[in-house]
């Protein structure tokens, strides 16, 4: 008999400690730009032209999504683990941004800045960010994109990492890295007199769970003060033939505030159930003739299906909303199979009566002929060889299962010796991962 046996070696929901919750991205709406006050003075016979930004104001980035249901998603990093978040009807994967509207003063205007010298000097304006250390406390942790994670003092179970984006005129937004734990230089603005440039800012952030919740809770919308942007003073003396001095100064500040959506903390881990009949799956392969390999390098021998049920509302539903995990699987080959995440040949057993010169290949129902690549039996996210089952659970139509059908092929494999007749038997384990 020709058989391929697959085993469910691991069946565990994944739990880690820290999770990335959501992204917030700012768009300019109901926004204004700070404008400078012009003064013309003298120091003795020397003329001094000064542009001063006055007053402190606040830029508020408010999430347009009223609430987020947040739950764990494993990652190989045990401290900073990203998670999926689910709105009412669609997934919000951690690489997507949740839109916000930005109101208040959102930047600086350099319209009206002029000089009487020839040539005019270029302004070199350092722009710094000052962390609100009364609200945020720097940690040694970094987000997946290497941004510092700050603990929110009022809610120590939560952390936030963020970036400020800068937009000059009609140019695209340039996101500025935050690699420092305290105050840091954002960038140095290079502005020419007379170019009427407006500099506006955006904010994007990620929230991180720093402590595993012991129960389901919710956190109301927060107005989270991140810190303040401040333009550093710049000046140049006795410029050009006219010997005029120029000054630019900011005697106020631009406070940055993040208004989060309502956050639901989900204590239970999402999971699915593997039907007992799938825990050990013998796959009987059809017999093939040795001569068939004279014209074929691989021949279909049989098929099998993997299916898990995710309909348990205890784990996968909250406040009437389904919180389905993404169901992934890794196959690990036995009998000396190379499990490095790139190999797609499953070694067959050797010995008396066993065929030689042949291996097996398991092909996916992906529509493009993908083959299973064998990896270690780990449920960790991004495990080598891990892939997402073709059909995922969905609230639509009442089908809360994940499944895929696989086909098994004989493959002529010269690395296994000359092709001889005999039995073909192999085994592989599969590890389900609920992410």
UniProtKB/Swiss-Prot annotation:
Instruction: Give GO terms for biological process.
Output: cell adhesion involved in single-species biofilm formation
Q: Name the encoding gene, please.
A: hifE
Family matches, as InterPro entries: Adhesion_dom_fimbrial, Adhesion_dom_fimbrial_sf, Adhesion_dom_sf, Bact_Fimbrial_Adh_Pro
* Entry keywords, A to Z: Fimbrium, Signal
Q: What is its main location?
A: other
Protein name in UniProt = Minor fimbrial subunit HifE
Coiled coil regions in record: none
Which cellular components does GO assign to this protein?
A: pilus
Q: What does this protein do?
A: May be a minor structural protein required for pilus biogenesis. May be the adhesive component in the pili.
SUPFAM superfamilies listed in its UniProt record: Bacterial adhesins
Q: Which family does it belong to?
A: Belongs to the fimbrial protein family.
Compartments where located: Fimbrium
């Amino acid at each position: 008999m020709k058989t391929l046996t697959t085993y469910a070696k691991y069946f565990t929901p994944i739990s880690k400690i820290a999770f990335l919750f959501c992204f917030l991205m700012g768009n300019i709406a109901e926004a204004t730009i700070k404008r400078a006050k012009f003064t013309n003075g003298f120091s003795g016979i020397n003329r001094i032209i000064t542009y001063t930004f006055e007053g402190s104001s606040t830029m508020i980035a408010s999430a347009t999504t009223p609430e987020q249901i947040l739950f764990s998603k494993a990652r190989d990093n045990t401290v900073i683990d990203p998670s999926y978040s689910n709105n009412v009807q669609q997934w919000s994967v951690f690489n997507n941004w949740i839109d916000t509207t930005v109101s208040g003063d959102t930047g600086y205007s350099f319209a009206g800045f002029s000089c009487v010298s020839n040539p005019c000097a270029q302004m070199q304006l350092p722009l710094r960010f000052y962390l609100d250390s009364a609200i945020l406390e720097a940690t040694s942790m970094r987000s997946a994109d290497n941004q510092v994670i700050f603990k929110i003092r009022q809610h120590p179970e939560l952390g936030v990492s963020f970036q400020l984006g800068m937009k000059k005129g009609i140019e695209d937004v340039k996101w500025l890295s935050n690699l420092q734990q305290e105050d840091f230089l954002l960038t140095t603005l290079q502005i020419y007199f007379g170019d009427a440039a407006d500099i506006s800012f955006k904010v994007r952030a990620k929230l991180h769970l720093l402590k595993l919740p012991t129960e389901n809770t919710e956190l109301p919308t927060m107005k989270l003060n991140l810190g303040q942007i401040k333009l550093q003073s710049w000046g140049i003396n006795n410029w050009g033939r006219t010997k005029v001095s120029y000054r630019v100064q900011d005697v106020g500040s631009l406070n940055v505030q993040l208004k989060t959506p309502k956050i639901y903390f989900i204590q239970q881990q999402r999971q699915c159930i593997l039907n007992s009949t799938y825990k050990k799956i013998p796959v009987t392969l059809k017999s093939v003739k040795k001569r068939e390999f004279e014209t074929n390098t691989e021949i279909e021998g049989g098929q099998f299906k993997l299916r898990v049920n995710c309909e348990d509302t205890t784990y996968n539903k909250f406040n009437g909303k389904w919180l389905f995990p993404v169901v992934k699987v890794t196959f690990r080959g036995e009998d000396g199979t190379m499990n490095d995440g790139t190999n797609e040949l499953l070694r067959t057993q050797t010995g008396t009566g066993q065929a030689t010169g042949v291996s097996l290949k398991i092909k996916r129902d992906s529509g493009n002929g993908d083959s299973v690549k064998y990896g270690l039996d780990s449920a960790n996210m991004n495990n080598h060889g891990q892939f997402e089952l073709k059909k995922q659970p969905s609230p639509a139509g009442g089908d809360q299962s994940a499944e895929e059908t696989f086909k098994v092929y004989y493959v002529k494999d010269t690395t296994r010796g000359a092709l001889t007749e005999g039995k073909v038997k192999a085994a592989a384990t599969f590890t389900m991962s609920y992410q």
